[in-house]
Amino acid sequence: MALTYKKAGVDISKIKQSQKAIGKLITSTHKLQKKAKIAHGFGHYAGIVEIPGGKMLATHTDGVGTKVVISNLMKKYNTIGIDCVAMNVNDIICIGATPISFVDYIAANKNDVPKFKKIVEGLVTGAKKSAMPIVGGETAIMPDVIEGEGFAYDLAGMVVGLVEKKDLVLGNKIKTGDVIIGANSTGIHSNGYSLARKALLKKYSIKDKIKGVGVIGDALLKPTEIYTNPVLEMVQKCKINGLAHITGGAFTKLLRLKNTGYQIDSLPKIPPIMELIQEQGVKMKKCIRHSIWE
């Protein structure tokens, strides 16, 4: 029987119900601040407000999900921060915004200075690659909330960006005949780990070495690619009608921009780690849908 995301403990349909209910509540706050006009709110890659001076202020928050579990199993903490930065900046650039500041949030079951330093080293690496300062953050020690043997933690962040109103990329100008151009990923990035873990670790150890894949844990921990520089350069030099960060939902994210049909006739080579996941009973459709393959 095929392994699915639902069987791995994540029911996407129920999550969508929660998002719909939350969205209605969030929308009710959109007229509370007269100095900032909401240009685009809940449901896009970033919340956008028009601020005095005519500029558009964009904000977005995201985390690394259960990739932290792999980090703990491998006892490797110096790259997970890159993922956190990437998941934020890769979304905010999808509206054409330049990331200008970042704050992080680390929650853990206990204080561990060496591990915290390694996590922040990754954040700094990601920030440098994005040309974006980290201006603050929060470290919360909550043993009653974050449970687990040894060290257990969660990692998230928030990015702020700026964009001129004329340079906004919202996807509303997408039209028939537009060309879709994709950028390669480094691997699984930061989505689909609940399913990937269930698929792989029932048969293999996290440190098993597989031909063509390498050490499973290393393959799973490859940092999420940061696309800030090439995407923003492209936005400045070319006419871009829409941008999509392919994460959870995979290629269906293209429909999030505008309900225009599309055909992708040239896909990149399937990453070896994904082929290994498929061999464990996860169908290709599920791999793509839950963005195990980006």
Q: What do these predicted ranges mean?
A:
Residues 2-94, 131-132, 142-145, 175, ...:
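N-terminal glycine-rich phosphate/pyrophosphate-binding loops that anchor nucleotide-derived ligands
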Residues 43, 56, 64-65, 75, ...:
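Glycine-rich anion-binding loops of enzyme active sites
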Residues 90-98, 256-257:
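Alpha-helix C-terminal capping segments
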Residues 176-218:
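Acidic, glycine-rich loop-and-beta core segments that form the ion-binding/anion-interacting portion
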Residues 28-35, 166, 284-287:
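Active-site phosphate-binding and catalytic loops of NTP-dependent enzymes
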Residues 63-76, 104, 211-215, 281-284:
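Glycine/charged-rich beta-loop-alpha catalytic/anionic-binding loops adjacent to active sites
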Residues 2-9, 115-133, 146-155, 203-221, ...:
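Glycine-/charge-enriched secondary-structure boundary and capping motifs
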